[in-house]
Amino acid sequence: MKAQARFLVLGAVLAAALSSASALPPDGAPSKEEFVPDPLLDTMQTELRRASVKLSRADPPAYFLSYSAYDGDALTMSASYGSLLSSFEGRFRHAGVIVRVGSPELDNTHGQNRRTAIVQGTLPLENDPDALARSLWWLTNRGYRSSAPAFLKVKTDTAVRSEEEDKSNDFALEPPQSHVDARVPALGLDIAEWQARLRRESAWFRQYPEVYDSEIVLQDQTSGFRFTSTEGSRIAEPNHLVRLVIEAMTRADDGMEMIRVETYQAPQPADLPSEAVIHFAIEKMAADLQALRAAPVAEPFAGPALLSGRAAAVFFHEVVGHRLEGHRQRDEEEGQTFTKKVGQQVMPAFLSIVDDPTLSALAGEKLSGSYKFDDEGQPAARVQLVQDGVLRSFLMSRMPIKGFSQSNGHGRAQPGLMTTGRQGNLIVTSTNTVKESELRERLIDEAKKQGKPYGLYFEDVQGGFTLTQRGLPQAFQVLPVIVWRVYSDGRPDELVRGVDIVGTPLAALNRILVTGDTMHVFNGICGAESGSVPVSAAAPAMLFSEIEVQKREHSHERPPLLPAPGFEGREKAAGAGKPQGGSR
């Protein structure tokens, strides 16, 4: 059994058979929709029709094919301490071909064989129909040669293995979709202007000798997603995402490495924060790192804790979100924490959860997990996962599970990987709220009630991960970066370092006492079996009766022996005035 962690960081079927002439109308367009020409999509659909006729008559027959393509431009530039490190701009076209052999009831993706259905490759950058068709033809040939023997193996394994508990089909039949917006947006930024800006912004770290490494990275990517299938879907949708990532690192005297990361994401470069905002963020990052170097190492602890909204959002992404992904309810290697709890209370009744990829912004922030169509060509949809503490649904791709036979628009994947049910915009709401400013006093009251000398306040996090497979502990780990001891006797709050939140889901969820009244958003990149996809999680701050923390593993490499260039002779003066731990 392979161990697999899901992590979060700050940073589709033919109705009957392919031989049916009605699967694709003669002109290649979905019925009852106006045909919108697009050279790449048109070539994909023409070659798909040709392949479907042949492969539907093969032995064993292919009953479903789909082509997807990602066509766009990407620009990445980075700078450190006032100088450019890199600047790359390029065009790309990637294709994914899915070939399903057998029938919707049983096909080559059954069990642990999902990856056999997809092959990936590059496409010509120019709209030459012959060159594009040739590439798609070769990928389709590879796809069938992978899928056909996999299906024969599935049939053999099914015959000799014990009966499965979930006897759902392997693929959900869905109506065809049509939406063609063939624009591929321009990158839309002035390269020279942004190179100069990154030089200026990265130079601000020069004044902080205890920041040992820092970098600012700008990523601007535009793409046009195209999708067509033998069921008649025809989709083209543009996308534009810009990310500005600021990273800074230092090391304590005991060798512990501390990293601060700030990530800003937007649909356009103009929507990124101003230089003044970035300057303030860098000053705070440097101050945080300086304070963390001097902060004491936290000890293992179990007691009351307050999670900021961002920390609570990551907590729910890891603890709940991954465990509500549909395929995990069917995979017998998974822990299936919530599989048989539909209709049961799984968390306090004042909490509800939806996943809504149709929402583009929340609480004044753009959401990274937004999309119109998922990677299986299904329209995005709002899904009520938990209502008043009661589990209602799962995040579904086109892989059915017991009790949930259709997709709800959450089939997502990194290009070239097989889709699974994934999170988009996970939103946690509460009906048991107090003003956010009151939560600290509530934390102190809870610590006094339990006879604890302090509670913990988790101000910011950098991400987390979770283990979901049986045979492994059904545990999660959230990685905080700014953590405070909030003393119950009135002493100032004390900054600590080297601490991770750990626990198991069912126990942790039922220790939430009350929440704040303000929503906070965490945008990040989530990695799992179907690759890395952009996601958002939103939640209010939350007070827990008990959170368990453990010491974080760290290296024992010493800080640099030499002072930073330009700071020779200043180390004594700097040492005399440096903070002996953070307090507030």
Language model features with spans:
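Active-site bordering "gate/hinge" segments
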Residues: A5, A23-F373, Q378, Q387-V390, ...
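Short loop/turn microsegments at loop-to-beta-strand junctions
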Residues: P379-A381, V481-I482
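C-terminal, non-catalytic macromolecule-binding modules
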Residues: R392-E446
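Conserved catalytic-core segments centered on acid/base and nucleophilic motifs
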Residues: V383-Q387, F394
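Bacterial N-terminal signal peptides
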Residues: L8-S19
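Hydrophobic alpha-helical bundle architecture
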Residues: G369, T429-A507, N523-S530, P534
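Short linear motifs in exposed loops
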Residues: P238, L395, L495-R497
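Residue-level structural signal for beta-strand termini and adjacent loop
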Residues: V261-T263, S397-M399, R497-V499
